[in-house]
Each structure stands twice: as structure tokens, then as C-alpha cells.
């Protein structure tokens, strides 16, 4: 029986290799590649990434990695320690589902973190009450001051897009924008 972390790392490796194939085959394509926090602690991961970046630097110039919050047991494994050996590769690392779970504001200060993907649940909550407490504006302003990309997920209408942009999102993602 394979350990859950090993199975996730195997899936992440397969998705990474498939993503690189697509990036090489389609020179104008830009991709976000999800990776589990536990995979980042796999000792083989930095070696694989280094090899792929060395062989396909232009492909990685058009890719970013979205660090997922799952699995929950990854909470005790510091993200900063996992990203440290990867810092020299010049890759973009975004915190996925920001505002929904275990990602903390402290992780936004990690030098390798270049973007936040604000979870759709925060958009829904703030849109429902017109962001009366300023939570969404706080997150987008915080990201902007740090020079980070801020994508708001779950945008499903023109009104939600306008709201997300008014709150300071640098990008939106969702069924409305055609990006899922």
C-alpha cells in the first residue's frame, strides 16, 4: 500500500511532466501548476525541478506553481523550509486558496512566494456583504504592497468581476472569465 504523501508526490510529478510537455509544445501557453505542500518536502522534488528548468528554461518562464493547502497534515511542515532549496530556480510560487484554511499571512513574506490566489469562499462572503469589513480590499492591498500577483477565484458574473476589480484584484479566475 502506497503512503498518501507518496501517492500525491507521484501525481504532482506526473502533472508537472505533462505540463512541461504542453509548455514546450505550445510556446505561447501560460500555465499554473498545482503542487501539494507535502510534495515540496519530497527530497526528489528539487532535483526534478532543477533538471527540468535547466532543460526547458523558456517553458518555466511561462509557468507558476500553486501551492495547495491540502493535505491538512502538511500544516506542520514549514513552507519556507520547503521553498528554500528551490529559490535559485527563479520560479513563481502562489499560495492557493488563500483565506480559506491554513495559509497564513506569514507565508506571504516568504521571498519565493510571488502571488496569492484568494479562495472563492472569501469572494462570496465579501460580495454578499459588499465587503463591509474590508477583508478583500485588505488582502489585495497587502499583496499589491508586497509586489505580488493577487488572483481572486470563483468569479462567475460581470458583477463579481467588477467587485473583485474594485477591491483591487490584479486578476480574476472563474467560469465568467472562461478560466477554470
Feature annotation, model-predicted:
Residues 28-30, 58-62, 88-90, 113, ...:
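A general structural motif
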Residues 1-2:
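A short, polar/charged loop-to-alpha-helix boundary motif
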Residues 6-79, 154:
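Catalytic core of bacterial c-di-GMP phosphodiesterases, primarily the EAL and HD-GYP domains
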Residues 15, 19-22, 45-52, 78-86, ...:
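A general structural detector for well-ordered alpha-helical segments in enzyme core domains, enriched
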Residues 36-41, 66-75, 91-180:
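EAL-family c-di-GMP phosphodiesterase catalytic domain
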Amino acid at each position: 500500500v502506497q503512503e498518501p504523501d507518496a501517492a500525491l508526490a507521484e501525481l504532482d510529478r506526473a502533472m508537472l511532466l505533462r505540463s512541461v510537455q504542453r509548455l514546450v509544445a505550445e510556446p505561447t501557453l501560460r500555465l499554473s501548476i498545482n503542487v501539494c505542500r507535502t510534495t515540496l518536502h519530497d527530497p526528489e522534488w528539487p532535483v526534478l525541478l532543477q533538471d527540468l528548468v535547466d532543460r526547458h528554461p523558456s517553458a518555466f518562464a511561462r509557468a507558476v506553481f500553486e501551492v495547495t493547502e491540502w493535505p491538512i497534515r502538511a500544516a506542520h511542515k514549514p513552507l519556507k523550509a520547503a521553498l528554500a532549496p528551490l529559490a535559485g530556480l527563479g520560479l513563481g510560487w502562489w499560495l492557493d486558496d488563500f483565506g480559506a484554511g491554513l495559509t497564513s499571512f506569514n507565508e506571504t513574506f516568504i521571498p519565493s512566494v510571488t502571488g496569492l490566489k484568494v479562495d472563492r469562499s472569501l469572494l462570496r462572503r465579501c460580495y454578499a456583504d459588499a465587503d463591509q469589513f474590508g477583508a478583500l480590499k485588505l488582502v489585495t492591498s497587502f499583496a499589491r504592497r508586497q509586489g505580488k500577483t493577487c488572483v481572486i477565484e470563483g468569479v462567475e458574473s460581470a458583477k463579481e468581476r467588477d467587485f473583485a476589480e474594485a477591491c483591487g484584484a490584479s486578476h480574476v479566475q472563474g467560469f465568467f472569465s472562461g478560466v477554470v
